[in-house]
Amino acid sequence: MFEENNSPTTDNSLWTLQGRQRASPAQRLHNLTSAGSSTSSSGLPLPQNIFTNPAIQPSSVINLNHSTDVVIGPMTQYQGPVSIYYMDYMEAHAMQTAAGINSNNANGNGNANRSRDKSPSRRVTRNTILLITLILLVLATGLIVLYVELNRPKPELPSNKAIYFGNNYDHQTFPNLGNGHLVVDREQWGASKNSHGLTIPLKRPIPYVLITHIGVQSLPCDNIYKCSIKMRTIQDSAIAEKGLPDIQSNFYVSEEGNIYVGRGWDWANTYANQTLAITFMGDYGRFKPGPKQLEGVQFLLAHAVANRNIDVDYKLVAQNQTKVTRSPGAYVYQEIRNWPHFYGCGMDEAPACGIELGMKTESWDAKQ
């Protein structure tokens, strides 16, 4: 309650507020209903200008001692039922976070729906661009390949003439026989460097051509790779097992009709000095010679005649006409006996082969 100060002055601003006990609810209601009169809790009248006089500064003259439930300043009072909810910081933060997540989910779902609405058209556009790019790359590649193929120099096709060489042929650079019959030199099929020096030269033109085969169940070879291996095997066997200085024959003919150089034009073969030995690569007691193989031998003979390596009237004989052997095989023998230069020496009552040259039986098995 308010009490008047004992100071002799009567200034209305010198009032002090002393502590009082907490009023009961009934007393508070009575105070509210009697708000029309300005009295203190003790029934003493308050000065009328205590709240309206600007000269009065209660903050400088009011002392609070052992008081409770004191309000200084404006206060709002509610009459009627009021519901007050208390929410601590954690609950408020959780609700705000949940609201944010829901908002984000709503935005995300909206964006996803919009993306799903737009993604098919984007996917179609992307696939179309990729397809067009791929087609353009394929077309460009095809055009480049076509251009390269059209501008690649074409190899000269061999002629189908019987003889393909002029008189200026150099035997040290053996040419292609034409018509697909290649000549594979010693360096090309990988001749061994361990061969011993050959000492018996061939005198040209050569009067006899001797036809042999490899035999011993040898399979015909049909490409340069396989035939080159076979040539090296024959040479190794001749040097290591038979004690010969080099491979036996002058030339070898494969199934595809290619010519492989053995001792060549300059050196005598291992059979007889005055002969040019041509060997069919395979066992022709078991296999038939192919048409390209037979043609390759004929082309080689035509080339040799044109260049005077063999006599114009050369005599063609099979090895079994000169000694007891199955070479060159029954199938080859059936073919060559019908060739124009075949010579039937050593058969039935015919004279021995080479007798006109002074050759004896031993001359056809020189092993040199």
From Swiss-Prot:
Pfam families, alphabetized:
Amidase_2 (PF01510)
Give me the glycosylation sites of this protein: N273, N320
GO BP, sorted A to Z: defense response to Gram-negative bacterium; immune response; innate immune response; positive regulation of peptidoglycan recognition protein signaling pathway; response to bacterium
**Protein name in UniProt:** Peptidoglycan-recognition protein LA
The intrachain disulfides are: C221-C227
Q: Per the UniProt record, which residue ranges are transmembrane?
A: 128-148
Q: Which residues lie on this side of the membrane: Extracellular?
A: 149-368
Return the InterPro entries for the record. Answer: Amidase/PGRP_sf, Amidase_domain, PGRP, PGRP_domain_met/bac
Q: Write out the ranges of the annotated region (Disordered).
A: 21-46, 101-122
The keyword Membrane is annotated on this UniProt entry: yes
In this chain the N-acetylmuramoyl-L-alanine amidase domain maps to 233-320
Q: Which UniProt keywords apply?
A: Cell membrane, Disulfide bond, Glycoprotein, Immunity, Innate immunity, Membrane, Transmembrane, Transmembrane helix
Q: Which organism is it from?
A: Drosophila melanogaster (Fruit fly)
Q: Which PANTHER family match?
A: PEPTIDOGLYCAN RECOGNITION PROTEIN, PEPTIDOGLYCAN-RECOGNITION PROTEIN LA
One MF term from GO for this chain? zinc ion binding
Which residues does the entry place in the Cytoplasmic compartment?
1-127
How does the protein associate with the membrane?
Single-pass membrane protein
Q: Which family does it belong to?
A: Belongs to the N-acetylmuramoyl-L-alanine amidase 2 family.
Function as written in the Swiss-Prot or TrEMBL entry: Peptidoglycan-recognition protein probably involved in innate immunity by binding to peptidoglycans (PGN) of bacteria and activating the immune response.
Q: Quote the gene name from the UniProt entry.
A: PGRP-LA
